[in-house]
């Protein structure tokens, strides 16, 4: 058990490789990443046995930026017999179970990478799931309750019709979504598809049980670069009154709610109205990430907001390095003013050449 598989958006394999190498080294674990461009996944191989399991436990998954899923895997199973793929897969799971008790496992995902080529296997994976699940249940696995806070999900990751990895992820340190992708439905009345980015961000960064407390009708939000209103829509839907800042036009449907005030101003120059306590700042402006970071820092340092979600666009080559630099600079700015804060960043499914960042100031 010396390998991890990490899913990602195709084209971001190098960022995942750099990130997992950094995170592993912080724990004193060393290895190397196997990267295939545009494959949608990375294999990280540790030099020492059993260290992949340690990484899957000890690297906080919600602190990984570019990985959609993290799991311990077997060696690649190749040349599977189409007449009986299940037997060698069960044997591979049995070998893994000698180190990990799969009696605590609750779910099986038969997956592929998120590429057009791999998606051709999706119908097969869906049909293969039922007989494989039955075979694994005969081993006494997959019997734990899905609501439990410990245990594992079992994964069968097909890279070709006759080649797969088998593995597991920890329930308390993984993505609970199939392929690491949340399935969100585009609201028919939303002004733009960008609304799904903020919806996914809220689902990712804000615990469900806290959402009504942290986003409600008693709060005020500001949306910088709001036009036509995809992000504003998500705040209004949750009851906030929103100052929508943009020279462009906002969707008429948002004006009809009576919950927005359109401010035709430059997002970099706008300041919140005096005597108004702004709770939330959101921002999806197309600008250099270093400039956006400084803008967000200004809002937090001036006490203009308490919580923010914003995007950093990443058109450059050294994307991982740029992200780390921006996040470190923001952290230093806030720490120097003795502010307590929590910062998270994620390359969301609905993000493209960008990441989404969440910062919350604490009392």
Curated annotation (Swiss-Prot):
Name the positions where S-adenosyl-L-methionine binds.
194, 227-230, 246, 266, 284
Could you tell me where this protein is found in the cell? Cytoplasm
Pfam families listed in its UniProt record: FtsJ (PF01728), RlmM_FDX (PF18125), RLMM_N (PF21239)
| UniProt GO MF annotations | rRNA (cytosine-2'-O-)-methyltransferase activity
Q: Among the record's GO biological process terms, what is one?
A: rRNA processing
Per the record, GO CC terms? Answer: cytoplasm
- Give the UniProt keywords, A-Z: Cytoplasm, Methyltransferase, rRNA processing, S-adenosyl-L-methionine, Transferase
**Catalysis performed (reactions):** cytidine(2498) in 23S rRNA + S-adenosyl-L-methionine = 2'-O-methylcytidine(2498) in 23S rRNA + S-adenosyl-L-homocysteine + H(+)
Q: What is its EC number?
A: 2.1.1.186
InterPro entries, from UniProt? RlmM_FDX (IPR040739), RlmM_THUMP-like (IPR048646), RNA_MeTrfase_FtsJ_dom (IPR002877), rRNA_MeTrfase_M (IPR011224), SAM-dependent_MTases_sf (IPR029063)
Annotated catalytic residues: 313 (proton acceptor)
Record has tRNA-binding as a keyword? no
Give the quaternary structure: Monomer.
Q: Which PANTHER family does the protein's record reference?
A: RIBOSOMAL RNA LARGE SUBUNIT METHYLTRANSFERASE M, RIBOSOMAL RNA METHYLTRANSFERASE FTSJ DOMAIN-CONTAINING PROTEIN
Similarity section: Belongs to the class I-like SAM-binding methyltransferase superfamily. RNA methyltransferase RlmE family. RlmM subfamily.
Describe the function of this protein. Catalyzes the 2'-O-methylation at nucleotide C2498 in 23S rRNA.
Protein's name in the database:
Ribosomal RNA large subunit methyltransferase M
What's the source species for this entry? Haemophilus influenzae (strain ATCC 51907 / DSM 11121 / KW20 / Rd)
Task: Show the taxonomic lineage.
Answer: Bacteria, Pseudomonadati, Pseudomonadota, Gammaproteobacteria, Pasteurellales
């Amino acid at each position: 058990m010396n390998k991890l598989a990490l899913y990602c958006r195709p084209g971001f394999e190098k960022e995942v490789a750099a990130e997992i190498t950094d995170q592993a080294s912080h724990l004193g674990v060393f290895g190397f990443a196997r990267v295939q461009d545009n494959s949608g996944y990375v294999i990280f191989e540790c030099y020492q046995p059993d260290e992949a399991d340690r990484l899957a436990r000890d690297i906080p998954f919600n602190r990984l930026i570019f990985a959609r899923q993290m799991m311990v895997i077997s060696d690649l199973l190749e040349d599977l017999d189409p007449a009986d793929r299940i037997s060698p897969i069960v044997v591979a799971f049995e070998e893994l179970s000698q180190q990990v008790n799969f009696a605590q496992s609750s779910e099986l995902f038969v997956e592929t990478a998120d590429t057009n080529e791999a998606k051709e296997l999706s119908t097969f994976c869906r049909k293969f799931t039922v007989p494989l699940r039955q075979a694994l249940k005969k081993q006494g696995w997959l019997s734990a309750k899905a609501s439990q806070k410990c245990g594992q999900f079992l994964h069968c990751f097909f890279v070709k019709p006759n080649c797969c990895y088998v593995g597991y992820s920890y329930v308390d340190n993984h993505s609970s979504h199939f392929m690491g992708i949340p399935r969100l439905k585009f609201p028919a009345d939303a002004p733009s598809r960008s609304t799904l980015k903020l919806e996914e961000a809220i689902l990712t960064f804000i615990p469900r049980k806290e959402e009504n407390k942290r986003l409600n009708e008693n709060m005020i939000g500001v949306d910088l670069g709001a036009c036509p209103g995809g992000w504003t829509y998500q705040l209004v839907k949750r009851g906030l009154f929103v100052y929508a800042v943009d020279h462009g036009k906002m969707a008429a449907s948002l004006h009809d709610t009576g919950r927005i005030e359109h401010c035709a101003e430059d997002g970099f120059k706008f300041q919140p109205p005096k005597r108004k306590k702004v709770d939330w700042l959101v921002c999806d402006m197309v600008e250099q990430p270093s400039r956006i970071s400084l803008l967000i820092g200004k809002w937090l340092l001036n006490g203009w907001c308490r919580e923010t979600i914003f995007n950093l666009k990443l058109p450059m080559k050294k994307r991982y390095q740029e992200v780390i630099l921006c996040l470190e600079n923001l952290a230093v700015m806030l720490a120097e003013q003795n502010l307590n804060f929590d910062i998270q960043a994620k390359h969301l499914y609905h993000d493209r050449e960008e990441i989404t960042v969440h910062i919350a100031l604490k009392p």
